[in-house]
Every structure is written in C-alpha cells, then in structure tokens.
C-alpha cells in the first residue's frame, strides 16, 4: 500500500518549474508502473513531462477524468522542514506535491478492480507558467482518451482539514498577464522641455487605468486590474525614455475579461497619444480561463460530499486566483473544488506547509467519488 506521507515528502523535495519536471515525471512513472504491474486494463502515455494513465472500462459508456498538476514554483523555501526542497530556488508552495500524492492514492484504489467506465488520470505539467492543460489539448495529447467529464482539486490553506468547498458556477477567475512599455525621449533633468518623460506618462496611465474597474465594470460582477511592477529610469537627474509596467487582469467571466483587456489597451494607447508617445501593449491570457463548474455535475459532487462522514461541505464564493484547469473545463464538462489543508501561510508563501493528515482524507473522499462515477 502506498505510503502517502512518504510519497508527499519525496515529491516535496524535488520541485521543478513547468515543462522541466523531469525528476518529478521519473518519480511518478516509477510509482505508477509499480502500481499498474499486472493490470492489463491499464495503458500509460507521456507527453513531454506529463503523464496520462488510462484505465479501460469493462463496459464503458463514458470516460471520467481526474487531473492533477505537477509543477513547482521559483520560490526559495523557508519552511525549515527536514524534507524541504533540494532544488535551490524551487518549492512546492502551491500544494502540487499534495495534489500528486492524492492522485496516486486514488489511482491505487481505482486499480483494485477494473472499472465499468473508463478512467483517465492526468498528471499535467506547467500549470503555473505555461498553461500545460491547454498545451496538451492543442497538441492532441488526449486523443481518444479525452474525458467526457473532468474533475480536479486544489488545496486551500484557510480551510480546515476535512473541509471541501466548491460551487455550481465559477470557482476561479480568468487571468491575463499584461505588459506595457511606454517609449518617449530621454534627456537631462534640467531640460524637460527637450525630452518626453516616459515615467510621467506611465504614472498617468497607472492612475487612469483604475477607472476601468470603477467605471467600465458592472459592480455586481467585479474585476481586478493590478500592476505590480513599474520600472523606469536609472538615476535622479536623467529623464528616462522608457517605462515598463507588468500587471494582471482578473475577471470571473471570459466576456468581462475581454472587456477589461480591451479597455486597458485603449487607456494605454490614449494616454500615450495624449503625450505624443509610443506604447506597446502585450496581453497574454493563454489557457488561464475562468474555472467554470458545470452546474449539474457540481451539484452531484456537492451532494455526494455532503453525505460523507468526516467531510464538511462549503458552498463557497468565487476566488480571483487563477488556474489553467479553466481551459480544460471550457472543452469538457467538469468540476473543481477546494480541499482544506489548514496552514497559516497562503499559497505561494515560502513557509506554506499543509497538514499531512489531509492526504488520507483527500484520497478517501476523491476515490469514493471516482468509484461512484466509474460505476454509473
């Protein structure tokens, strides 16, 4: 029987960023091959650093998919754990080590007998940086294994162990990366009339763009426009010719995301034109679409967990965090939910350390749900 805690600790020590998860893939394949030995109803495929494990059903009417992400983050770990990251500047600070371990535990249970329906376990790379789900889908990695229904979870530090939270609508926002570069004319600080100050223009933009959310977005729907990077200038007495901004747009529907993206671009171009300056605007959403749960499937999942002993189900509001599972759910009906891990530190924090007792709870809950779906 799989040692869940040891498996998690092994994976926690080898975090790798998206599409570089070579050690992670090798570890997972070793475990998967041991679990599936002698199971002639199982097939395994790889796609770059990803893995697909397909359980052929005995009387299949559909394929049920379970997705887990496998990549880490470019963060220096500060947990002080004896099994902390062995990869300098890399950390499983988003709980993907937990996601993988739970998926392996569920796979082990699913292999106890051949399911009626097909089951697909997806170990997806590059959730954090390259929208690996979209890359796999667009590259045809699923082939005839593409699920009819897709499910997945994400750990959540501010929920207690034993709590599962989701809803029948949108769980995560869609996110769009924004890069803006204003190009003016540099000069001496004493002669501003001979220059065109990119720093001043970018500052105008930062204040003006706040009106997008306050005046273009329905306040009932909401959206976020945040610029976390502002780079301009090299010294105090030189007017800079360029200013660079790097930010994010977040919205709970794709229509709203597209509206905000359009308005941000328009404001940037308008401010630049007003100051007779050039501007470059790069908008990159890729596969980070809103995670929209299928209402009927979500209701079914919520009712199932609501009746499980040891599980407290929470009907939760959407979060403005992003997840590339939204892309797969735009292609396949499915559901995502939060799993409580009770950590005082948020996701992506260098000290984030979930409670390990959630591993057994997660495996028991998810595997029982997948068993039900596979038997329908």
Swiss-Prot record:
Domain of life where this protein originates: Bacteria
EC number(s) reported in the record: 3.5.1.47
One example GO MF annotation: N-acetyldiaminopimelate deacetylase activity
SUPFAM superfamilies noted in UniProt: Bacterial exopeptidase dimerisation domain (SSF55031), Zn-dependent exopeptidases (SSF53187)
GO BP of this protein: diaminopimelate biosynthetic process; lysine biosynthetic process via diaminopimelate
Active site residues of this protein: 69, 128
Reaction(s) the record says it catalyses: N-acetyl-(2S,6S)-2,6-diaminopimelate + H2O = (2S,6S)-2,6-diaminopimelate + acetate
Protein role: Catalyzes the conversion of N-acetyl-diaminopimelate to diaminopimelate and acetate.
The protein's name in its UniProt record: N-acetyldiaminopimelate deacetylase
């Amino acid at each position: 029987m799989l040692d869940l805690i040891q498996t998690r600790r092994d994976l926690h020590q080898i975090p790798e960023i998206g599409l570089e998860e070579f050690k992670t893939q090798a570890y997972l394949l070793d475990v998967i091959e041991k679990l599936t030995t002698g199971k002639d109803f199982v097939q395994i495929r790889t796609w770059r650093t990803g893995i697909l494990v397909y359980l052929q059903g005995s009387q299949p009417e559909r394929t049920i998919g379970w997705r887990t992400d496998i990549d880490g983050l470019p963060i220096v770990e500060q947990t002080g754990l004896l099994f902390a990251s062995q990869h300098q500047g890399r950390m499983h600070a988003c709980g993907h080590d937990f996601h993988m371990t739970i998926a392996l535990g569920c796979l082990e249970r699913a292999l106890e007998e051949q399911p009626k329906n097909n089951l697909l376990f997806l170990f997806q790379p590059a959730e954090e940086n390259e929208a690996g789900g979209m890359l796999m889908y667009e590259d045809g990695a699923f082939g005839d294994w593409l699920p009819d229904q897709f499910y997945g979870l994400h750990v959540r530090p501010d929920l207690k162990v034993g709590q599962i939270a989701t809803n029948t609508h949108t769980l995560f926002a869609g996110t769009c990366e924004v890069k803006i570069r204003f190009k003016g004319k540099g000069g001496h600080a004493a002669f501003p009339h001979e220059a065109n100050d990119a720093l001043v223009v970018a500052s105008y933009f930062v204040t003006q763009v706040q009106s997008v959310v306050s005046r273009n977005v329905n306040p009932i729907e909401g959206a976020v426009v945040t610029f976390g990077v502002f780079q301009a200038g090299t010294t105090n007495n030189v007017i800079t010719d360029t200013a660079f901004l790097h930010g994010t747009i977040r919205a709970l529907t794709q229509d709203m995301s597209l509206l905000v993206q359009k308005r941000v671009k328009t404001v940037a171009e308008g401010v630049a034109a007003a100051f007779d300056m050039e501007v470059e605007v790069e908008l990159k959403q890729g596969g980070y679409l809103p995670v929209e749960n299928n209402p009927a499937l979500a209701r079914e999942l919520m009712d199932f967990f609501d009746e499980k002993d040891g599980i407290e189900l929470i009907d939760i509001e959407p979060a403005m965090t992003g997840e590339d599972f939204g892309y797969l759910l735009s292609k396949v009906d499915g559901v995502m939910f939060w799993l409580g891990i009770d950590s005082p530190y948020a996701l992506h924090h260098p000290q984030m350390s979930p409670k390990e007792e959630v591993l057994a709870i997660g495996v028991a809950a998810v595997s029982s749900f997948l068993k039900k779906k596979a038997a329908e």
